[in-house]
Amino acid sequence: MKVKVGVIFGGETVEHEISIITAVQAMKYIDPEKYEIVPIYISKDRIWYTGKMLMDIEVYKDFEHLKRYAKKVAFYKKNGTFVLQTVGMFKRVVEELDIMFPIMHGNNTEDGSIQGYLETVGIPYVGSKVLASAIGQDKVIMKQVMSSINLPIVPYTWFYDINYYDENEKILNEIKELGYPVIVKPATLGSSVGITVVKEESKIDQAVREAIKYDVKIIVEKVIENLVEVNCSVLGNYKYQEASVIEEVISTEEFLTYTDKYIGKSKGDTTKGMVATNRVIPARIDNKLYKEIQELAKETFKVMNLSGVARIDFLIDNKKKKAYVNEPNTIPGSLSFYLWEKTNKPYNKLLDEMLSIAIKDFKTKSKKIYSFDTNILSNFNGLKGGKGLKGIKK
């Protein structure tokens, strides 16, 4: 009997379209002999849809016109079964699911939001869990976690938008202490959205205000001179970690832009996702640094308690031959399958391993104790606060 996999993608996020591309790519490679795919698309206005038509990338080029052919649904646990049920007056179950596969990028989705919902319903799902996903989306918190075990990170400072207006001089001085040039980023966005490199103090205000358009939390990092950007994917969970080959990404700008990542040199075909990035595999770095980065990638994956596939991005000071952990991507674009193909792991096998890890993790978690019987409510005597609890010492 085939396992029914709900592939969930889209959502209200600036990385909506990238999520669609990654999901459609993955659905083509999930083994049809073992799994039955149920596409679940969340529109930008947060409406859930299902239907086999949603596996075709062409649908999304004119979705407003074609959406009437898809089914609007809600996700529930009903009589012990996970179901997609139509909305409206006459509700009916259209699909039963065994496991969810979130393929979503950015705020409101990848940041633990969708994972939290799936945890609440109780269905197994692929990838990192709520806390790991949330940390992986927040560039400030992730740096604090990484620095706690002395992983190498670039010097940085951070602040909220309201602090920038209320304590402007203090924050500008903190940025100045980093030393220009710096790079200004929204703290919880990905895909290089809202990012600006600032070479002189006179341009910092404009860059910060641009980042504030996208986020309330801003991070400013010291720019690494003689920069080489490399990425390494990791597959596994808290028990074991396997590192992929390392790619060297080629940017047309001072940092890897949205265009570099998802469009590359292509003229018209924007359906390749991260595959469109200009890259060299394996990265052109010496063997010692290569192995060091693979180990750092696995350490980062483990300390953040990631699961499934992640991509760890690194910055290398090519003059000093020193690598810095830039950030982990808990649901990387294209699921980094192109790195695993170069590691002799075809995409269908990668997806199968991700699903297997999720099922094993769910079984492990199911053996843990998360609730127990108490007599607190039976002794509760009205709404009198702590004094109404008989037999309980304060």
Residue ranges and their predicted role:
Residues M1-L131, I135-Q137, I141, Y160-K170, ...:
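ATP-binding N-terminal substructure of ATP-dependent carboxylate-amine bond-forming enzymes
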Residues V3, F9-E12, N150, N278, ...:
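ATP-dependent carboxylate activation and anion-phosphoryl transfer catalytic cores
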Residues S19, I153-W158, P181-R209, E229-N231:
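Glycine-rich phosphate-binding loop of ATP-grasp-fold ATP-dependent ligases
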Residues I37, P124-Y125, I153, V182, ...:
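Hydrophobic beta-strand scaffold residues
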Residues Q137-T157:
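Short, glycine-/small-residue-rich phosphate/pyrophosphate-handling segment
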Residues M146-S147, E174-I195, V216-L227:
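ATP-grasp fold ATP-binding core
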Residues F159, I195-E200, V234-N237, D317, ...:
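Short beta-strand-to-turn element immediately C-terminal to the catalytic PLP-Schiff-base lysine
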Residues K199-K272, R284, K288, E292, ...:
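Phosphate-binding site of ATP-dependent enzymes
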